[in-house]
């Protein structure tokens, strides 16, 4: 019984202490400091779960082997996304360190999102980040082209190793 009470108290106390630290200004809010591991872990898992849920039911209208759509997606990425997410020539000068949460640098780490998840992120944006919604700025077909391209980006290090 004591163990159960301790467990319940822990369930209530831990989030209460974190919330209290947050509202009293004891948690860092700047974009440059490295966040605590628990914060990154909770935030990334919540984002992954959200993207998985938002992608359910979406049907990608572009065939995976559509070379013209891939080339168009690559151009759209270079014109609209590389400034934050980096390119083959390197990470974004400011997107890699001046944002929190950090802006994913796809060319350095690759992606582990499906085209449907990338579409959901581009179309509707990501709350509490610098990723805005593009649905009013880009045609739906173009969002799918970018999403297909992003889902296929592999890290440059892996690509150079496999070329050896």
Feature map (PLM): residue ranges:
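Winged-helix/helix-turn-helix nucleic-acid-interaction surface
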Residues: 94
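Short, non-ligating residues that shape and space the ligands of small metal-coordination modules
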Residues: 90-91, 140
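Extracytoplasmic electron-transfer domains, predominantly the class I c-type cytochrome c fold
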Residues: 98-152
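Protein kinase-like catalytic domain
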Residues: 85, 151-154
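Periplasmic c-type cytochrome electron-transfer domains
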Residues: 2-71, 115-117, 135-149
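Extracytoplasmic/periplasmic copper-protein system
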Residues: 157-164
């Amino acid at each position: 019984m004591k163990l159960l009470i301790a467990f319940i108290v822990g369930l209530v106390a831990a989030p209460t202490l974190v919330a209290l630290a947050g509202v009293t200004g004891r948690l860092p809010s700047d974009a440059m400091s490295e966040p605590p591991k628990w914060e990154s872990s909770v935030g990334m898992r919540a984002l992954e779960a959200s993207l998985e849920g938002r992608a359910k039911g979406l049907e990608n209208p572009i065939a995976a082997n559509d070379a013209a759509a891939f080339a168009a997606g690559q151009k759209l990425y270079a014109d609209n996304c590389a400034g934050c997410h980096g390119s083959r020539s390197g990470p974004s000068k400011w997107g890699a360190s001046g944002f929190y949460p950090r802006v994913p640098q796809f060319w350095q780490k690759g992606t582990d999102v499906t085209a449907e998840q990338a579409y959901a992120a581009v179309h509707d944006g990501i709350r509490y980040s610098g990723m805005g919604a593009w649905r009013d700025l880009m045609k739906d077909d173009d969002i799918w082209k970018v999403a297909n391209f992003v889902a296929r980006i592999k890290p440059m290090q892996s690509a150079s190793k496999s070329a050896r």
